[in-house]
Every structure is written in structure tokens, then in C-alpha cells.
Amino acid sequence: MTAYIFDSETTGLNDPQLVEAAWLKLGSITDLPVSSEFLGRFKPSKVIELGALATSHILDEELVDCPSHTTFLMPEDTQYLIGHNVDYDWGVIGHPDFKRICTAALSRRLWPDADSHSQSAMIYLHYRKQATGLLRNAHAALDDVKNCRLLLSKILDALAAKLGRPVEDWEELWSLSEEARVPTVISFGKHNGSLIANLPSDYKRWLLNQADLDPFVRKALSK
């Protein structure tokens, strides 16, 4: 079972295209040893949005001689893709057939009282003394995957304490991530903020009939 922590920098929120990609290949779930790493830049076919420029500081003119964004592929042995809000990065690279492990969902489940669950906020929560240095290059893809690995270590410690034993393997971590992604509170609509378990049955039925309903909200409503 092969797992990669992956992060991307993109052209922005509107039909995003890849401009920078980074990954860490993890040797095992026990100590999260890094067996190899990658960082590369890619040329998009559209202009980078100002909001993305302000985040990544990657300029269009720096990418002129880079390979096309369409040429990027994860290594062939990829089975598990790990990331903070991993679905975004997974979507940018074309929705490949990998099992996705979301550190953001696991963070929300493990530390529900935190006022923010961004990766940077989680680094401050768990590595307060080192956080300023660790986050100096936040939103640079390679720094982000390295920080995600640090967060993943704390997630595994917290899960081990909760389970009474270490997480067995990537497959179990994926199952725990899938469970964490199923919400307990509705975050939209007229019942925003209500426990899903307490929603009126007719409203639940109406939501389940919506074709574009988030699949994890659908799971929560179907319980």
C-alpha cells in the first residue's frame, strides 16, 4: 500500500489548472518516513487569477518554459492520496482513481473546538514554538506537504489515543478519514447549524432528492 502526501498551487478557484505540484512518498504509517519527494512547476493555458497570485506568488511569466499542466501525473504506484482538503488537489489533477485521506476532515473530527481547522491553524495548535518558521513559506507546495506530514503525525497520535492502539495501516486511516468526512451538523439552508440527526424527516427526504447533494452529506442523511 503506497501513500503520497500531495499539494498543488493553481491558477485560482475558477476552473483551476496546475501551476506547481509537490508530493512526499511515505514509506510506512509507523513513523512516516519519506522515501522520495517531488516538486515541479507547470504552464497553465489560462492566466493566473489575482487571488492565486497573492497566495502562491507564482507569476505567469515564470512558467513560460515549464511543461504543460496537462503532463503532470502522480507515480504509477499511488494508492492513497493524502492532503488538507484533498478533494481540491485531487480534482486539479483530473480525479485519478486513488483513495483520498483528508487531514482537514480528520482535524475537524479530532479537535472540534478549534476555531479554525486550516493547515496553518493546526500547525500553530500542535507546533506553536516552531510554527512561525514552519509557515514562512506556507502556500508553497513542497513546504505545504512537509507541514501536512507534521500534522498527520499528530493526527495519528490522537487516533491511537482514541482507539487504544496505533492505526494499523493506510487502509484503516482511509476508513477513519471517510468516517470523519461524514458531517454531523448541516452547514447550509434554513436549518444551518442544526444536528443532522435532528432534521425534520420531510426536509431530509427533500435533500436526498437533490441530484447535486454532497455525497458525504447524503451518507449522513441516510444513516
Predicted regions and their residues:
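Short runs of predominantly hydrophobic/aromatic residues within well-ordered alpha helices
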Residues: 103, 145-148, 200, 204
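Acidic, Mg2+-coordinating catalytic module of metal-dependent nucleases/exonucleases
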Residues: 80-87, 91-93, 121-188
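Eukaryotic low-complexity, mixed-charge intrinsically disordered interaction/regulatory segments enriched
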Residues: 183-201
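Conserved non-catalytic scaffold segment of RNase H-like nuclease domains
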Residues: 1-108, 112-139
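Short, surface-exposed, low-complexity cationic segments
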Residues: 197-219
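Charged, low-complexity intrinsically disordered segments and flexible loops
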Residues: 146, 216-223
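Generic structural signal for hydrophobic core residues of well-folded globular domains
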Residues: 110, 126, 155, 207-211, ...
